[in-house]
Amino acid sequence: NKALSLFKMDDHEKVIGLIQKMKRIYDSLPSGKITKETDRKIHKHFIDIALYANNKCDDRITRRVYLSKEKEVSIKVVYFINNVAVHNNTIEIPQTVNGGYDFSHLSLKGIVIKDEDLSNSNFAGCRLQNAIFQDCNMYKTNFYYAIMEKILFDNCILDDSNFAQIKMADGTLNACSAMHVQFYNAAMNRANIKNTFLDYSNFYMAYMAEVNLYKVIAPYVNLFKADLSFSKLDLINFEHADLSRVNLNKAILQNINLIDSKLFCTWLTNTFLEMVICTGSNMANVNFNNANLSNCHFNCSILTKACMFNTRLYRVNFDEASVQGMGISILRGEENIPIDSDTLVTLQKFFEEDCTSHTGMSQTEDNINAVAMKITADIMQHAD
């Protein structure tokens, strides 16, 4: 009642202070001392204050939660004003200067938003649990520092949005357009990104352990120093992408197309690679130790000083690749058989057939010296 009377005098600053005081008193009460009826009345008072504030268009107190086409709120649980619970009530927030809506620092649980225009909206610092955004336009939406748990973006436009420094667990981006999006320093554990466009997006130093990337188009994407350990990448198109210093330890890479991309000093240790096609890419100083490569091509790529120790190779093609200073050893049981990089330079194709059955190598130059041929023959004879 005091808050409402203060509103009538347009003394909004005192109202804000009063609400904060009410919240502190409410939080300090022992749970056993609050009956359901008292709890309901307290919530009703907060709602009355919020609705009155909304009529005054004072967005310092109210927050727009979900505005549908009929201008009605459709949400089950919302935390508003320092996480005070509001159940099944309408709280409408005015639009921001850019035409979006301000959800910042709200705790939103179980919301379902479909076919809405949320472009230029602000979710900075939000906590989103079991939230679903479907068929929404979220162009230039700000999720900076948001916390997301089991969130789903389905067929949404996320272009030019900001996901920097978010904390996402078990989130999904399905059939989305996420071009020019900032994901730098984002934590996206066990994220599932599929059928999505990531053109020009920035994942600088993003932590993406156990991520599943499937059918993703990612030209000019920046993954510099990102961590994708234990992740699975399948049917990915990287063109002019930067994957330098990326940690792909114990990851699975299948059907990957890398064209004119950078993988300088990238970690591919203990990684399984199948049908990875690298054309004209810079893979200098890449670490393939303990990796398993099957049907991979490194055509016209730079592998200078790359490491392939304790590595299994099956039908791997180094056609016109630069391999100076490359360190290679082939696994045979528990023994490693070294291959001199100078020998590899003389060959256009290395291991044309399965190492376990093929005992010869195609000669690409008639003048391969006898020493190189003897080393190659010995390796192939005893290769695993």
Regions found by a protein language model. Name each.
Residues L18-M22:
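Amphipathic alpha-helical elements of HEAT/ARM-like alpha-solenoid repeat scaffolds that form extended
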Residues K14, I42, T62, K69-V73:
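Positions within the helices of HEAT/ARM-like alpha-solenoid repeats
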